[in-house]
Amino acid sequence: MNQLEILRESLGQCDEIILDALIMRNRIVEDIMAYKEANGLQILQPEQEAKQKEWLENRMEGRRHKDEVADVFECIRTNSKRIQARKLFNYNIVLIGFMGAGKSTISDFLKNVFAMDVVEMDQIIAQRQGMSISDIFETYGEQYFRDLETNLLIEMQSRSNVVISCGGGTPMRECNVVEMKKNGRVVLLTAKPETILDRVKDNHDRPLIENNKTVPFIADLMEKRRAKYEAAADIIIETDGKNELEICEELVHRLRIMDEK
């Protein structure tokens, strides 16, 4: 055996060690999730990720290949998050609510803590059409836009473990709600009209309220939609006075209770 073969054999032994360690680590991730659930502990603990990064930074101080090792550990953390997400949710999480209720914010937070894919319906539709939502409304009309929403929801039936952030009007169509529930749990995020106005006042891609950014108008439109929103929802979460972590922890907790019934 020449020197190159010896080195390659040593490399293969390293790979065996890494593989065994990864299998063990993934098993431990599942055990941690089970322990948290069994003992009623908080599922989301983002501070733990910060501790892991600090530990790695200290261990790699002054060593070669620091960036490459950091990339590997980032991949390991991402896959650990996905293992947690699949253990918690074997379905899509469908976020509905009035514009400005926090759907995009919560989608981003879930993506960060669980490495879940996010489908922002308005964003996807705008990208595919090559124009803003306002321009779609103006050029083709609301009916055309609503049909695009329905088709996208149908498309999502082939996927799972995805966060789907719906436009404010999406749940108003009964056929859309049917599609949401085929492979998802529907979470309604709510907020007071005053909160909604504060969140959307500087956004100009909201055609339904662009010329009516007032609390009374928003309150009236929210009331008109309330019954259908609530009928579509599996759970309802108020977002006023809560940060992203509190909202997502409540979301996870209540979905788990629902799944256990």
Predicted regions mapped to residue ranges:
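P-loop (Walker A) phosphate-binding loop of NTP-binding proteins
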Residues: 98
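Walker A/P-loop
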Residues: 104
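Domain-level signature for soluble enzymes in the chorismate/prephenate branch of the shikimate pathway
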Residues: 1-90
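A glycine- and Lys/Arg-enriched "phosphate-lid" helix/loop adjacent to the NTP-binding pocket
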Residues: 183-226
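ATP-binding Walker
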Residues: 101
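NTP-dependent small-molecule kinase module
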Residues: 109, 113, 227-261
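Hydrophobic anchor at the beta1->P-loop junction of P-loop NTPases
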Residues: 95
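ATP-dependent small-molecule kinase phosphotransfer cores
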Residues: 120-170, 175-178, 206
